[in-house]
Amino acid sequence: MSNLIFSLTQPKHVISMPQATFTNDDHVVISLIDHPSSQDLKRRDQHEVLFRRINTFLIKNKIIKNNIIDLGAWIGDNSIPWAKNIAGIVYAIDPSPNNCNFINDTCKLNNITNVKTLQYAITNNNQILTTHDDLGHCSFVYGNPNNNGQNKVQAVSLDYLYASKSIDNIGYIHLDVEGMEYKVVEGSENVINAFRPLVSFEQHLEIDNYELILALFKKHNYVVFLINEILPGCRHDCRNSLAFPVEMYNDNMIDEIHAYIGKTVLERK
């Protein structure tokens, strides 16, 4: 009997779950699923470090509030940490079914219930877009001037998703759409007018028409700042920018962001 009792009370061997810590996203810890993309996710904390820290400041100070659109969500390296830092919904939008499945599975493992994946490409209207790239990480613009790539996907606008009640109450839009930024904003007029969200967007300053998208934001009464941060693994001219609606913006906010991250990186355009 004593041997039986002894065997029943032995501690079980616990297999530790691999994890990623996003130190620059308020130290969010994510358990990783058994998938090749999990290693990419684990490394993302050290990419776009200043951008991540700026977003953390904006979330902690409730400048980013309500729901978030993460467009070009890829493997959820922004969507998932943000979902753990806000009470609202993160709409993770990406054209790749594999990326959306990876995000969903990672969220399930971590009991994250406020991420909604939407498998679409986004542009200024409803149409078929094509790419020569794998959908997992692609551009519908670069290297495809005639829209005749072998991979085809359904594209819609953010205004279409809003009208169809797929998205609502938007406080922040993040765009990483490889050359489609202008068209995405062009197709978001109703969303912008209804919610006046903060917008971040990535551009290649030497090959994208940065002045064109600046003019579009100014037309909507936004103030744009470039984040002067070199992005590892990207072209040397790749930069993120932040567009603040004029009613949200003030000089003190910019000073507070610089104080929080410890350096001056925001350049008004």
Describe the residue ranges of each PLM region.
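Internal alpha/beta domain cores that form substrate/cofactor-binding pockets in large enzymes
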Residues: 158-163, 168-201, 206-261
